[in-house]
């Protein structure tokens, strides 16, 4: 392995040197494009808190200018030496090389970690980036750090070795010397450092590349001064850093302000480099990661070159690895530098490392060293991969390698103190302070990772704004290649700490889903590629880490899982964070706004877990996870519901949706983390099992990662997602979604799918459909019944439908709806059946009453109306076809008509004139009687023409029918008037006669349509006027002349038959009245039959005895009745009429007038028959074509018959 790594290292070193030179040139060009001195932010991102934070950071990290010079002078020579020595050493030394890599990575991590601190201060001052040296250094000095890298790196190596030795002692004491070096690094990394170490390594690599290209100038001067300052500050600032971090974390209430600035600074740096306004989004945290990416790319190139130059520095870092246990991050930085330097190396690493990752992943999961190694792997990976990573890393490209060197030293000291403090704090779980310290103090890995993600962004933004835009441009480019790989994984850890506080604020304020999307999408390729290197490197590192005490591996394993899910922050932060990430990330995903409490607790838990994991094996890690779950439980009460459905957490996944495509590669590690995260989310109350499972799964995940080393970029993507998460819990969720795409995404999608199903809109639509069906069915059955029934049924069905719809909506149960529908259908069916039965029964009853009424009426008419026996027979036949309704209405209308009609008749001698003024009741009855008398056929025939739809004339159509009848009546009346006017204008008598006859037919149709109208003009009056018109037409020519032509005779026959049938229609209209009068008069005559004298009626009247037969005194009874000489009854004793009841007189007159219509009809019919004999052929053909016309024929038949006859006449050669 060592030999293989050595070969890789040599090749990579060469590639790195070339790449660094190239990238330095590019970085310089790009830096020229971007003013170096241009302030990152027009205004300080933060005011009061930012100043306070920057002061603390300066105190912790030292003055930026001093550190810049110190680091540049220090890191540049070492980087050159390191790069030279490195080639000879295995690219991925199992023990020593890795230790060296870990040392440099830890240095980088510290540098990156410091950027986190500086990030907060840097965020407040735009121009402060240069003023707050330590804060700005992370971003501004990536190249400077790289320049000074070797010196600070060595010093940091010593520091980090001291720190790592402490952690390594805690974590594991049974590893080989190289492994011990690595293990201290790894152990320090696993605690807080591991996640950060990748970032640091990336920072260191960036610093190397940049220092080789840009910072080599001030390398020596800045090196010594800055190295000393960095060491002193690191030693002095560990507590200060911890304080600052703790203040950030301890101010969870203020996380938005304190925690937020660090992420914003990266975002700001990125914004300054890419978009000047992006700094505004630093509050979003990771939103601006993508913004940083462009500038980071430039630093990455420099970084790649510097990483080549830094092999010697890495070697010293190796020697000082024990100290650099925290600097194991710096070791990672060298690796990341190499990774960033050589894309080809990264590709090679990607290809070669997958198996090592499998072996290493499980043990080194807890160790951030694997991140540095993955960084190396990316270096081995082809330059294309490196450039891809570079490209992807721009947002992560942090010129922190140089800064990282000085800041790494500061951070190493801070990390040592912070780690101890973090461990204490984690143990304590002050969730507010812990999260800030978690990002910076808690896990140096976290701090490094945070620096890598958040700080990398912050420092990158700062550096892009100032000198870092020059030195960091090249370094960023190189680091972006290398760091992104490492930073991807470590980044998730910074997200853990910053994520807890900052993300809480960000989740509430700037839900980092956008940052995640932009950053994840922008960096996704970088992270994926880098994560390949990171995953491979991490697997290698994990392998040495696995050699290192189990605590390291456990912590790294935890990190691996957390990395895996691209929840990188939580996972990479610490092993506990990994556990926490499961809980915390889901929680963050579900409760982006609630993360503040939970995240602080988690950050502390992460620090504790990392501290504990360092000394503890997997078992202890599980314990730590248990403890951490407790911390999570604090924040988790909110997230329990949301975390448990972490698969459903996809709610935040919408934000993660974009990142998801990125994490497809990181799926294995994300799966691991997802598994652990899912377990905690499923068992929030039992976080320990999830964490245990996370720890147990970590090996599996490591294996998965090794298998998916090609998916390593996904790890880095997760890290990047984690860093994005730092800006918000949603980002963590997104990372998680990315990692868990296979597992988590499905739950998320399922959750989304479930929610739509819960909405249950289909039931409503079903209800609507059912309603439509019911409506269609209801009208049909109702059509059989009477219209009122239809309306009622419709109302019932509508009510039922509404009820059923309401119930179905309430229950949202299709079954219930179906049942209701069935009930509705059954009800509708029952209603329909009931309506049909009722209709049938009513029809049968009507028929029976009809038969009875006609019989009685016919008997009465026969008894009282002997003279018009024929008329009585006709009336009886017609009445037999008529309904009994008229009979039922007879009493009142008859009385009214009897009382009112006589006065009318007295006023006029014509019965026709008396009838029209009759009351409405009488008119209605007359209409009914007319229909009855006209025979069922006539009534039925009338229906086709807007005639009332009364087959027998017994039932009056409903209101709708009345309206249509009225419309039809008006229409026919207009047509009749038009034809009449035309006829009047015509000169030809024959043509005029024909036109008049056509008008007559229209009048007849109007009368038929008006029969159903009770309040409309009486059909009786229409028929009467029509008869008058026919008489006028007949008067135009003398049709009695035998010499008239056959056409005229035929025309005369048609006119006579029309008159005859119209008379019959008039009789039918008054039939009910006539029948009543007949009964009344017969009774009256019976009572007076004792008087044998003819004037008996008159005598009775003269006696003044009121007629007992009178049903009721008519209103007209009070009116003095005058004898009507013209009455058909022709009372003999006119003078005695005064004593005769007026009602009897009126009834007698009306009776005679109405019955006279029947007589007239017969007379006219006979005349027509006489004329027909002369033209039998014509009428025979007409009858054959239409139908035989008779006295009892309906008016409809008459109209049809007459029209056909007129048509034939017109068509005949002799026609008019």
From Swiss-Prot:
Residues 252-266, 429-438 have a biased composition (Pro residues). The keyword Nucleus applies. InterPro entries: AF4/FMR2 (IPR007797), AF4/FMR2_CHD (IPR043640), AF4_int (IPR043639). It is found in: Nucleus. Coiled coil: none annotated. One of its GO terms (molecular function) is DNA-binding transcription factor activity. Residues 207-217, 710-728, 824-846, 867-886, 902-915, 1115-1125 have a biased composition (Low complexity). Pfam families: AF-4, AF4_int, AFF4_CHD. Component of the super elongation complex (SEC), at least composed of EAF1, EAF2, CDK9, MLLT3/AF9, AFF (AFF1 or AFF4), the P-TEFb complex and ELL (ELL, ELL2 or ELL3). Belongs to the AF4 family. This is AF4/FMR2 family member 1. It comes from Mus musculus. The gene is Aff1.
């Amino acid at each position: 392995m060592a030999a293989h790594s050595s070969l890789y290292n040599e090749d990579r070193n060469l590639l790195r040197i070339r790449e660094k030179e190239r990238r330095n040139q590019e970085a310089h060009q790009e830096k020229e494009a971007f003013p170096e001195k241009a302030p990152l932010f027009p205004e300080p991102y933060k005011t009061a808190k930012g100043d306070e934070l920057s002061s603390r950071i300066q105190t912790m990290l030292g003055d930026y200018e001093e550190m810049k010079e110190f680091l540049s002078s220090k890191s540049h020579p070492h980087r050159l030496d390191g790069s030279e020595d490195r080639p000879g050493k295995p690219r991925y030394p199992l023990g020593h090389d890795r230790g060296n890599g870990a040392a440099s990575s830890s240095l980088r991590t510290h540098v990156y970690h410091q950027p986190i601190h500086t990030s907060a201060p840097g965020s407040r001052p735009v121009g402060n980036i240069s003023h707050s040296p330590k804060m700005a250094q992370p971003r501004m000095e990536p190249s400077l750090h790289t320049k000074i890298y070797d010196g600070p790196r060595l010093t940091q190596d010593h520091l980090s070795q001291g720190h790592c030795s402490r952690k390594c002692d805690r974590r594991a004491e049974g590893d080989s010397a190289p492994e011990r070096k690595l293990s201290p690094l790894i152990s320090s990394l696993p605690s807080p450092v591991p996640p950060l170490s990748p970032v640091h390594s990336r920072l260191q690599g960036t610093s190397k590349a940049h220092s080789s290209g840009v910072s080599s100038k001030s390398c020596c001067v800045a090196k010594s001064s800055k190295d000393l300052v960095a060491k002193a500050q690191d030693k002095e600032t560990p507590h200060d850093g911890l304080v600052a971090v703790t203040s950030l974390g301890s101010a969870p209430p203020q996380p938005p302000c304190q925690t937020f600035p660090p992420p914003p600074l990266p975002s700001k740096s990125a914004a300054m480099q890419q978009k000047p306004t992006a700094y505004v989004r630093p509050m979003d945290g990771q939103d601006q990661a993508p913004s940083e990416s462009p500038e980071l790319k430039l630093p990455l190139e420099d970084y790649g070159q510097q990483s080549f130059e830094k092999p010697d520095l890495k070697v010293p870092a190796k020697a000082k690895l024990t100290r650099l246990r925290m600097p194991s991050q710096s070791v990672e930085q060298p690796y990341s530098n190499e990774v960033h330097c050589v894309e080809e190396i990264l590709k090679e690493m990607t290809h070669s490392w997958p198996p090592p990752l499998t072996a290493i992943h499980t043990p080194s999961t807890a160790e951030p060293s694997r991140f540095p190694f993955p960084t190396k792997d990316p270096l081995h990976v082809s330059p294309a991969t490196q450039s891809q990573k570079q490209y992807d890393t721009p947002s992560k490209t942090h010129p922190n390698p140089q800064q990282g060197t000085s800041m790494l030293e500061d951070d190493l000291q801070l990390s040592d103190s912070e780690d101890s403090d973090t461990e204490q704090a984690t143990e304590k779980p002050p969730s507010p302070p812990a999260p800030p310290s978690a990002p910076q103090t808690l896990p140096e890995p976290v701090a490094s990772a945070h620096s890598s993600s958040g700080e990398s962004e912050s420092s990158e933004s700062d550096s892009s704004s100032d000198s870092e835009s020059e030195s960091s441009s090249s370094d960023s480019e190189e680091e972006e290649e290398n760091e992104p790989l490492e930073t991807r994984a470590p980044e998730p850890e910074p997200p853990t700490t910053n994520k807890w506080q900052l993300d809480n604020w960000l989740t509430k304020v700037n839900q980092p889903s956008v940052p995640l999307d932009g950053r994840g999408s922008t960096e996704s390729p970088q992270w994926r590629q880098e994560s390949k290197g990171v995953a491979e490197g991490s697997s290698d590192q994990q392998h040495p880490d696995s050699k290192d005490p189990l605590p390291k591996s456990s912590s790294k394993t935890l990190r691996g899982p957390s990395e895996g899910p691209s929840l990188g922050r939580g996972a990479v932060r610490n092993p506990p964070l990994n556990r926490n990430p499961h809980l915390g990330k889901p929680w963050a995903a579900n409760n982006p706004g609630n993360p503040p409490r939970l995240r602080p607790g988690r950050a502390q838990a992460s620090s504790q877990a990392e501290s504990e994991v360092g000394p503890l094996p997997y078992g202890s890690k599980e314990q730590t996870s248990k403890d951490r779950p407790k911390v999570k439980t604090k924040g988790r009460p909110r997230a329990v519901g949301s975390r448990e459905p972490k698969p459903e957490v996809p709610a935040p996944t919408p934000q993660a949706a974009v990142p998801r495509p990125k994490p497809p590669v990181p799926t294995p590690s994300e799966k691991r983390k997802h598994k652990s995260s899912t377990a905690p989310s499923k068992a929030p109350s039992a976080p320990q099992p999830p964490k245990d499972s996370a720890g147990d799964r970590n090996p599996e995940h490591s294996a998965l990662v090794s298998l998916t080393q090609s998916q390593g970029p996904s790890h880095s993507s997760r890290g990047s997602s984690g860093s994005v998460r730092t800006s918000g819990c949603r980002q963590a969720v997104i990372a998680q979604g990315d990692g868990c795409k296979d597992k988590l995404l499905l739950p998320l999608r399922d959750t989304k799918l479930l929610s739509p199903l819960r909405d249950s809109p289909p039931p409503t639509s079903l209800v609507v459909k059912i309603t439509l069906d019911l409506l269609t069915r209801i009208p049909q059955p109702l059509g059989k019944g009477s219209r009122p029934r239809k309306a009622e049924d419709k109302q019932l069905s509508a009510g039922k439908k509404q009820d059923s719809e309401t119930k179905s909506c309430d229950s949202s149960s299709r079954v219930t709806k179906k049942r209701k529908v069935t009930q509705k259908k059954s009800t509708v069916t029952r209603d329909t059946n009931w309506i049909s039965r009722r209709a049938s029964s009513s029809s049968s009853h009507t028929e029976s009453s009809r038969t009875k009424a006609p019989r009685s009426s016919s008997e009465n008419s026969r008894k009282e109306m002997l003279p018009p026996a024929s008329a009585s027979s006709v009336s009886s036949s017609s009445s037999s076809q008529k309904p009994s309704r008229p009979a039922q209405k007879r009493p009142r209308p008859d009385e009214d008509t009897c009382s009112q009609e006589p006065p009318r008749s007295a006023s006029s001698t014509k019965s026709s004139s008396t009838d029209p003024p009759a009351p409405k009741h009488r008119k209605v009855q007359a209409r009914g009687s007319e229909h009855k008398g006209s025979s069922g056929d006539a009534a039925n025939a009338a229906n086709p023409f807007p005639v009332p739809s009364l087959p027998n004339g017994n039932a009056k159509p409903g209101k709708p029918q009345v309206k249509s009848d009225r419309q039809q009546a008006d229409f026919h009346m207009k047509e009749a008037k038009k034809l009449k006017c035309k006829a009047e204008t015509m000169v030809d008598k024959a043509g005029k006669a024909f036109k008049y006859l056509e008008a007559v037919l229209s009048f007849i149709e109007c009368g038929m349509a008006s029969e159903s109208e009770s309040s409309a003009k009486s059909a009786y009056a229409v028929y009467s006027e029509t008869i008058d018109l026919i008489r006028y037409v007949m008067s135009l020519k003398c049709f009695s002349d035998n010499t008239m032509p056959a056409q005229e005779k035929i025309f005369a026959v048609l006119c006579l038959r029309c008159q005859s049938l119209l008379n019959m229609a008039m009789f039918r209209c008054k039939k009910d009245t006539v029948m009543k009068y007949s009964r009344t008069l017969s009774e009256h005559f019976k009572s007076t039959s004792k008087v044998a004298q003819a004037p008996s009626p008159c005598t009775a009247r003269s006696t003044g005895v009121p007629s007992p037969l009178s049903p009721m005194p008519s209103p007209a009874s009070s009116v003095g009745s005058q004898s009507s000489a013209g009455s058909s009854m022709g009372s003999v004793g006119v003078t005695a009429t005064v004593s005769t009841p007026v009602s009897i007189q009126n009834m007698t007159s009306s009776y005679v007038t109405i019955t006279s219509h029947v007589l007239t009809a017969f007379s006219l019919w006979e005349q027509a028959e006489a004329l027909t004999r002369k033209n039998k052929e014509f009428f025979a053909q007409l009858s054959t074509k239409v139908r035989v016309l008779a006295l009892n024929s309906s008016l409809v038949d008459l109209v049809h018959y007459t029209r056909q006859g007129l048509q034939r006449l017109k068509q005949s050669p002799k026609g008019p």
